[in-house]
Amino acid sequence: MPGWSCLVTGAGGFLGQRIVRMLVQEEELQEIRALFRTFGRKQEEELSKLQTKTKVTVLKGDILDAQCLKRACQGMSAVIHTAAAIDPLGAASRQTILDVNLKGTQLLLDACVEANVPTFIYSSSVLVAGPNSYKEIILNAHEEEHHESTWSNPYPYSKKMAEKAVLAANGSILKNGGTLHTCALRLSFIYGEECQVTSTTVKTALKNNSIIKKNATFSIANPVYVGNAAWAHILAARSLQDPKKSPSIQGQFYYITDDTPHQSYDDLKCTLSKEWGLRLDTSWSLPLPLLYWLAFLLETVSFLLRPVYNYRPPFNRLLITVLNSVFTFSYKKAQRDLGYEPLVSWEEAKQKTSEWIGTLVMQHREIGNKKSQ
């Protein structure tokens, strides 16, 4: 695939930024277009530093702007679509989440057909497969097993329907008579440097005597390090453009995890931050069934108040279920078809993430020292 080019949507996000950074190392890549709704000054500076032999073009635009998407896709060989409204708690309106995740994906697929882009990789989520109950056990699941989310919550529903649209679009005829080839990568929880979930957890703990609130004690998950998640996208882009590999990949989805040990989300938070004195809350917490029904009551209150007041519960049944389920996946199919092997070991991922958490702790202490002076 000599002289190829790639558009990355959501390029200012946690995963998108890492994909762009890895793409510039691709020897035969001529141009990367980095599309994001709004880039901060720091993000733009970091992207400008990536200018090597590969041209990096920064594009500001909305995933719901069809004309913007057509311009962004023009002349591209591949699209990696990471842009999404990630909102399991439902803080944004249902329509907003559906528009960004589902309508935006369909508009981008249409733009690919119009602009003759033959390769489309979609960043999906394991939440399209469940878990549908915290009592359900899904252990080392693989693609041949039929797991599908039954939640009506806008985030898992929109991701599920968007993935279906992407896979159904495989084989679409492009405007020039060519063929669109698609695949989807179902990512487990992504951790690593610059993870907003981890950042919020750490900052909240630092304001609470370095105590991390427990909310995921009963889960068993296999999160994926951001560098490995990004690497899977690079391999998918390569493989879909390889005439020998592409036929077995077209229209397929893949679970993407790595060799991070299976553990609860609470244990992961503790492991990554304990070097800096952060520790899990040891106080009593509500039993899981009671917590689940409390979430149901809060959702009911939110529904009843909706005509007069927009009440957003602090947690919901989806979040309680996701954070307290046995829900792990195998990456063997990606290994077989894409040649995927984690680039970064658990030990290295743990060290890099811990060092980054250390910078957050230092920043917090510096701010505290300035206030006390």
UniProtKB/Swiss-Prot annotation:
NADP(+) binds at residues 10-15, 155, 159. SUPFAM superfamilies: NAD(P)-binding Rossmann-fold domains (SSF51735). GO terms for molecular function: 3-beta-hydroxysteroid 3-dehydrogenase (NADP+) activity; 5-alpha-androstane-3-beta,17-beta-diol dehydrogenase (NADP+) activity. The active site is at residue 159. Signal peptide: none annotated. Its main location: endoplasmic reticulum. Kidney (at protein level); found only in the cortex, appears to be associated with the proximal tubules; and a minor expression in testis. Its EC number is 1.1.1.270, 1.1.1.210. It is found in: Endoplasmic reticulum membrane; Mitochondrion membrane. GO terms for cellular component: endoplasmic reticulum membrane; mitochondrial inner membrane; mitochondrion. The chain crosses the membrane at residues 288-308. The keyword Cytoplasm does not apply. The modification N6-acetyllysine is found at residue 350. Keywords: Acetylation, Endoplasmic reticulum, Lipid metabolism, Membrane, Mitochondrion, NADP, Oxidoreductase, Steroid metabolism, Transmembrane, Transmembrane helix. Pathway: Steroid metabolism. It catalyses: a 3beta-hydroxysteroid + NADP(+) = a 3-oxosteroid + NADPH + H(+); 5alpha-androstane-3beta,17beta-diol + NADP(+) = 17beta-hydroxy-5alpha-androstan-3-one + NADPH + H(+). It is a single-pass membrane protein. GO terms for biological process: response to stilbenoid; steroid biosynthetic process. Catalyzes the conversion of dihydrotestosterone to its inactive form 5alpha-androstanediol, that does not bind androgen receptor/AR. Does not function as an isomerase. Belongs to the 3-beta-HSD family. This is NADPH-dependent 3-keto-steroid reductase Hsd3b4. It comes from Mus musculus. The lineage of its organism: Eukaryota, Metazoa, Chordata, Craniata, Vertebrata.
